[in-house]
Amino acid sequence: MVTERQQDILNLIIDIFTKTHEPVGSKALQESINSSSATIRNDMAELEKQGLLEKAHTSSGRMPSVAGFQYYVKHSLDFHRLAENEVYEIVKAFDQEFFKLEDILQEAANLLTDLSGCTVVALDVEPSRQRLTAFDIVVLGQHTALAVFTLDESRTVTSQFLIPRNFLQEDLLKLKSIIQERFLGHTVLDIHYKIRTEIPQIIQRYFTTTDNVIDLFEHIFKEMFNENIVMAGKVNLLNFANLAAYQFFDQPQKVALEIREGLREDQMQNVRIADGQESCLADLAVISSKFLIPYRGVGILAIIGPVNLDYQQLINQINVVNRVLTMKLTDFYRYLSSNHYEVH
């Protein structure tokens, strides 16, 4: 069990260590901890026994262990503080006109990367929760066409495909009509279910030759299930991550899944410190925070960095970016939902 004084000592060691990256001795703590040097040393020894501190090889000082950082995150981190001294710069960064959602998310990711020196990922609303609001097929050539999906009246997804050999022009119109009648207004998850339950019977009814039609449905809708993800500061991983982690970030869909799995449905923020047993994010910390995307749902901002981060400072920064980002997205979607010619 960690006493209140021992927790204060651990918090102070982490605060000093994340700023200096040097082992911390008892003398450095005496000004802030109202106890003798001997008492502080005894408490540090007890924290070491509990696995929260570890000895440095080059000095008599102590450093926080991975378990120490995990304890700090769980018991001492304030998730509601704001980096008030950085509010102006963050607001200023968003003071520009954006033409699509991805540009706004990229600005947020770039800003957090500049502030933290870490890698940052921003995720749109989870694909399965997005709603199909428009659909069309554009014929590109004699044998190719483009399926164009609009999700949540704001995000466009395209899927190019080869027109099946046995398809007539009227078959493309049937395909378009079925999708518009059966899928518009439904979530991507609902559509995934309908393709497996309703569509096989409908195809039998409307198409003379049904070969490959289900496969075509699967192909053109596959893109809708991909995460809309932006990333910034990937090169920063080279400063603190192993090669396996760096290569893992070449697979954005897997990165998105990893981030989502680290944040429960009922959590707005979380700090996850991965130990060496978790190969894809071994010895890395992930600070995840949900943000509101008005009229649509929630997205996620995630900072990925080394374990010895200044967690409180990063939480303060991500809180400010979240608030300013939500304000910008509110303006963006209010404009999208308004009559263009009535907006001044």
From Swiss-Prot:
GO biological process, one term: negative regulation of DNA-templated transcription
Top-rank taxon, per record: Bacteria
Claim: Transcription regulation is one of the keywords in the record: yes
Keywords: Repressor, Stress response, Transcription, Transcription regulation
UniProt-listed InterPro entries: GAF-like_dom_sf, HrcA, HrcA_C, WH-like_DNA-bd_sf, WH_DNA-bd_sf, WHTH_HrcA_DNA-bd, WHTH_transcript_rep_HrcA_IDD
Molecular function terms from GO: DNA binding
HAMAP family, alphabetized: HrcA
Family designation: Belongs to the HrcA family.
Reported function: Negative regulator of class I heat shock genes (grpE-dnaK-dnaJ and groELS operons). Prevents heat-shock induction of these operons.
Name the UniProt record assigns to this protein: Heat-inducible transcription repressor HrcA
Organism expressing this protein natively: Streptococcus pneumoniae (strain P1031)
